[in-house]
């Protein structure tokens, strides 16, 4: 049977392509280890059907803790060990201080003018200074203490009013509580469109997880439209922008001292000053950072902590005994009551080890060509630091997959990124600037939930039947909502 002209041309094209591939001159440069790759998509086929942080960890265990990934058009290096994390985030920190441009950052984050995604440069340095001295200083975080205490008590009352023995959707309750805390910290009060604002933030977070086609083929603009990503993000941004505009328009700037300023007060003061002029869009981008990133990371950490404690009755009993002995029947918990509770803090540290809010941190980008241990790294190469893999490295952590809070009893590891085998908030110039606020929004809610109530799974299920499946978005959440039965 004769071949059609079309088939003949197709076969000839394939043969020519394979010939060119086979006869292509081999590079004399030292190449980073990598898995087998395919044309066009690179290594993406290795990550299909996996949680990205777990898939990348599995590849690193086969090919090395410093390896190369080709994600579509994007050349990427992956760091999966404390040794390489320390080398890159200290010696080469400024070289990899940029952020890769993304479609989400362009549309949602007002052209990458928020704190998280802003490119490295003078604008970002001013934002970082603003966070350190004003928005996220220890003093400013402390000033929101009464808000945290009030909203935690509101959650306790809500659970008690629902009645003992009835299942509670803790996922929803925790997310709503922390969203309200951050709304009051940002705007001085809960906003009237709180539920709509929260739902929009949740949708943004769902859109930012994983490896998106728009970001792995950035030059193929038609894919941004074919995938529907640009249209979805544009629609979300329009709703978000209208809501934030209304919030800002209705906001009454505080006339009291700086100590009592809300986050929006600070931003509006600076917007109208020559000290650090901000545009209206800059203000909105920063507010979205404070609310979106803060709500998702803190609520996920509280959920994972409770989930791990449910599966580990010994640890649950120990942390509840510590709380109840220290508080001795006190009704409302104040932050001073729990600052020195050792085991509660061990539980939080171990939760952050197993479930870092951003397991792949936020990707960085190389600002200039660099020689890294003999490997030539090109400008614009993407950097992924897999803190999920680092935090579970069996070379540094005994029984690395197990929940054992006691491992930190005599462990001086610094939670703020000084020790590179434990990086819950990243490290270096681009580490999470909101770590202090995030920890405050974890410690008090967790203490209240554990102090006031005993918890069990619905329908008589045993503790080891709790589903711990992950869902990957902007942060790694539980795939199923945490439904538990309180008793008090």
From Swiss-Prot:
Gene3D superfamilies: Cytochrome P450. Pathway: Secondary metabolite biosynthesis; terpenoid biosynthesis. It is an enzyme of class 1 (oxidoreductase). The keyword Membrane applies. Keywords: Endoplasmic reticulum, Glycoprotein, Heme, Iron, Membrane, Metal-binding, Monooxygenase, Oxidoreductase, Signal-anchor, Transmembrane, Transmembrane helix. It is a single-pass type II membrane protein. Residues 1-6 are cytoplasmic. Residues 24-488 are lumenal. PROSITE patterns: CYTOCHROME_P450. Glycans are attached at residues 169, 260, 379. It comes from the Eukaryota. GO terms for cellular component: endoplasmic reticulum membrane. It is found in: Endoplasmic reticulum membrane. Its cofactor is heme. CDD domains: CYP71-like (cd11072). One of its GO terms (molecular function) is heme binding. The keyword Cytoplasm does not apply. Involved in the biosynthesis of germacrene-derived sesquiterpene lactones. Catalyzes three consecutive oxidations of germacrene A to produce germacrene A acid. Could also catalyze the three-step oxidation of non-natural substrate amorphadiene to artemisinic acid. Belongs to the cytochrome P450 family. This is Germacrene A hydroxylase.
